[in-house]
């Protein structure tokens, strides 16, 4: 089972809000996930990225790989701190 850190879409039509979740790579985009490690709200100005660093490091230590989109969000979040 390959585990990925990726985005799941929430919100309503034309008003997206995303969760950063840890999920099996074969699960559906908005399907079953293992843990929530953060949120991303692109509709705010500037966009709001909230990450639980403790959970994130725990999952990365276990071998979870972030998607390219999540990697770029993590870089932006680190730059804003």
Swiss-Prot record:
Q: Which GO terms describe its biological process?
A: translation
Keyword Transmembrane helix in annotation: no
Entry-linked InterPro entries: Ribosomal_bS16 (IPR000307), Ribosomal_bS16_CS (IPR020592), Ribosomal_bS16_dom_sf (IPR023803)
Q: Which GO cellular component terms are attached? A: cytoplasm; small ribosomal subunit
Keyword field contains Ribonucleoprotein: yes
Could you cite one Gene Ontology molecular function of this protein? structural constituent of ribosome
**What keywords appear on the UniProt entry?**
Ribonucleoprotein, Ribosomal protein
Q: Which PROSITE patterns match?
A: RIBOSOMAL_S16 (PS00732)
Q: Which family does it belong to?
A: Belongs to the bacterial ribosomal protein bS16 family.
Q: Which NCBIfam families match?
A: S16
- Protein name as catalogued: Small ribosomal subunit protein bS16
- Protein encoded by which gene: rpsP
């Amino acid at each position: 089972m390959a585990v990925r850190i990726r985005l799941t879409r929430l919100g309503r039509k034309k008003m997206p809000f995303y969760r950063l979740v840890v999920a099996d790579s074969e699960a559906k985009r908005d399907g079953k996930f293992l843990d929530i490690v953060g949120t991303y709200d692109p509709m705010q100005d500037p966009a709001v990225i909230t990450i639980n660093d403790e959970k994130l490091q725990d999952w990365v230590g276990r071998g979870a790989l972030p998607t390219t989109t999540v990697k770029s969000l993590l870089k932006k979040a680190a730059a804003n701190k």
